[in-house]
């Protein structure tokens, strides 16, 4: 590809993203409630402006990855060094456990960065752990409904300092032997009033995570392999067509390599691919933003009402019924909603406990947010050969449809 064209394409994508984000925030409205206004150009200091005035760095970027290409056995995995966290989000003052495996066995380092704008660097260094003892931790057996749950020993227990601001945090793992790197990812949340709530789409990251092999996302089964796009296989809740997935495992590289290949995002789910650009822009503009997980939307409905606006970003496909109800209640209480992605509020899932009893760690398909009428109509079409429970209509929440009285 011509270098000049590459540069112009990058500029075009950046400008498109900025324009889309700005339009989305400007047009945000509380459907069905009394909306609160969000200043287009925030004035004065707020925690995000103060945070982004601190020195940034680009050291958060991975420089050497080794994502396995041995299809279909370990495609998209980073077996030389990989890890996961004990929670999707954590409050400042609490502790999060980070589980890491190295193969071959190697000492490793862990550097923690908060992502944001930071003068264009995209991240700020927060903490470093050196000379950590690595070990090769076992790949879990196939469990009920094809669930793969790791029970790795913690490598680090990180107490989140009280002064760490809400945000998306990356843990950069670097093996001493060979220097191979990958990420772990977690969210620091808070409960302060804010302009915007940025919801990370981590249930969808989980749905598309095929770790440990190219076979264990919601879109794989024993008979047909990847069912999402292979000859347009049916979308189904049947056990024969889809399995269960859990957070207790590393994130592999995003499995839809026909859309994007980015091995240097390995371990971050879909955050760096689809969500970080908007976070970068929001913090550049100085909006007072706080970050939450899909799991927080599921568990803490009242907490959504502390914001003027709620933003669904990235690939926000999989929701629980509790998420739908909580966001609807926030809207009715006057919180503005912005859905800045496609394929949102589509698949309905429950959140179940892990084998160890930790809440909200496992999910499976349970239905679609289509409403009864549309669900029945689509089930009769060619290719929609499976019936499944119909949740409420996602379009009603997103403003794509309205009920007539």
Language model features: what each stretch is:
Residues 108, 148-193:
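Extended acidic/polar, glycine-enriched regions
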Residues 9, 31-74:
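C-terminal segment of N-terminal export signals and the immediately downstream linker at the start
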Residues 105-132, 178-303:
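Aromatic-Pro/Gly-enriched surface loop or interdomain linker
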Residues 347-405:
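An acidic, glycine-rich "communication" segment
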Residues 135-150, 157-159, 163-165, 267-353:
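Helical hinge/lid and interdomain linker segments adjacent to catalytic or ligand-binding clefts
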Residues 94-98:
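Structural beta-strand segments of beta-rich domains
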Residues 1-15, 29, 38:
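N-terminal secretory signal peptides
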Residues 85-90:
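Short beta-strand segments of immunoglobulin-like
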